[in-house]
Amino acid sequence: GDDMHGRFLKAAAERAGINTEGLVMDPAAATSLAFVALSDSGEREFSFIRDPGADTLLRPNELNQQLLRNTKVFHVGSVSLTAEPSRSSTWQALITAKSTGAAVSYDPNYRASLWADDAAACDQIRSILPIVDIIKLSQEEMPFAAGIDDVDTAIKVLRKEGVALIVITLGEGGAVVATGDQQRSVPAFPCDAVDTTGAGDAFFGGFLSEFVKSGKSVYDVSIDDMVRFARVGCATASLCIGRRGGIPSMPTMEEVTELLNG
């Protein structure tokens, strides 16, 4: 929304060097708000104010077609699939980006309170799997995306859907990566958790950054590449959860490199 919260987030993104050219500021609707309660161990509980939020009101005609046609990776979550018109806008953006050669990256980022019920969440979360190239799931999200809570079986299900690069994060257990008929485990970096907010985003940001730098298509990525990408993701997440907040906790690339080389 074009309100104090929306303007704050736009400015924060720009300070971080993020291109906001495709951002749409709705003058009539409020920015959705997320509140995070932390346990002593740094685990989170979410609540939202969103009735409706400006994010759910994004219309297909507001999409920046030039940006979509010139992107290398189009990243999407399931939050924009919870309501119309953002659901239709998400689909149009996905089809446009995919048809012009972008790799489609997907982090369901399941938030129970944003869905009418689990069945609706499952239907929508799984609906876009056939056009996804890269996916990151947490253990908690496996039943919604793959219909099973077993890592090996979930990977098989996602392979059958045609997903080329699969990542399942396991918290302190690190991550499992898979491509083709191969899979590997990648250990986490030890750390004292202060706040796990943003850990998944930090991991996938590090992973996707390395994927883009590789210059490879999703079909040329080897299992060794996947391990390398995931190590960067694990290092990024480790630094993130050692700090408080969703945005201030994000580390720099220099910090990640130092941890990887330490």
Question: Where in the sequence are the language-model features?
Answer:
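Glycine-rich phosphate/pyrophosphate-binding beta-alpha loops
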Residues: S32, S78-T82, A237, R243-G246
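Short glycine/serine/threonine/alanine-rich loop segments
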Residues: I18, A102, G246
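Conserved beta-alpha-beta core of the PfkB/ribokinase-like small-molecule kinase fold
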Residues: V73, V79-V157, V163, G173-G174
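Conserved residues at the C-terminal ends of beta-strands
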Residues: D26, G77, S138, T169, ...
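Short, hinge-like loop/turn segments at secondary-structure boundaries
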Residues: A12-R15, S39-G42, A121-I125, T153-I155, ...
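Short gly/ser/thr-rich secondary-structure transition/capping motifs
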Residues: P52-N61, L114-A120, I148, V218
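Conserved N-terminal subdomain of the carbohydrate kinase-like
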Residues: G1-S78, T257-G262
